[in-house]
Amino acid sequence: MVGTKYASEKRVFTDIKSGARITQLTNRGINFHFYFTENSFDLDGETIYFLSNRGHEETEIFNLFKMNLESGEMVQLTDEPKGIEFGKITKTPDSEYIAYVTENNIHLYNTKTRENKLIYADKEHMLITQLSFSCDKQWIGFNRNEDVDALPDGGPNYAGFKEK
């Protein structure tokens, strides 16, 4: 549920092989940062945004959370019934806006006002990927393609490649 707060799960330990100090931020549910090309950290250096199935532990429904890195406290920011699609989320460098895809819809979440609004809806059988904000935060670019069930090593767009 939006606004639900979760207590810190942080723990610190030393890696046996390297001797490096490790800080584990979460220890329940499935949690992950945005896609590896997207920055999950806020410019303030105190906050990280992440996706989690927290509250839906028996499913793969992921919603947006933020964590205070000092205290470890987490707050749920969205409650999408079908969840946010992995790899289909981005934010502005200052973390004011976060855009994400759920059910072929693009939502815009304002981290300052907590307003969450639908800004684009598409029909079924379309793929929306690679969201990106313009530098002035006035535009969101994204890929929109017909879903033709093309696979990385097969399908109609990969004629001549080895089939599965």
Describe the residue ranges of each PLM region.
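Short, flexible, glycine/charge-rich loop motifs used to bind or transfer phosphoryl groups or to couple energy/partner
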Residues: 12-13, 38, 55, 79, ...
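Ligand-binding pocket scaffold of soluble enzyme catalytic domains
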Residues: 39-40, 46, 59, 74, ...
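Acidic/polar residues at beta-strand termini and the immediately following turn/coil
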Residues: 15, 42, 56, 68, ...
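Low-complexity, flexible helical/coil segments
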Residues: 50, 58-64, 85-86, 139-142
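Beta-propeller blade signature
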Residues: 64-70, 161-164
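Asp-box/WD-like beta-propeller blade repeats and closely related beta-sheet repeat scaffolds
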Residues: 79-164
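Beta-strand-rich domains and repeat architectures in extracellular enzymes and scaffolds
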Residues: 2-10, 17-62
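Multi-bladed beta-propeller domains
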Residues: 11-33, 67-84, 111-127
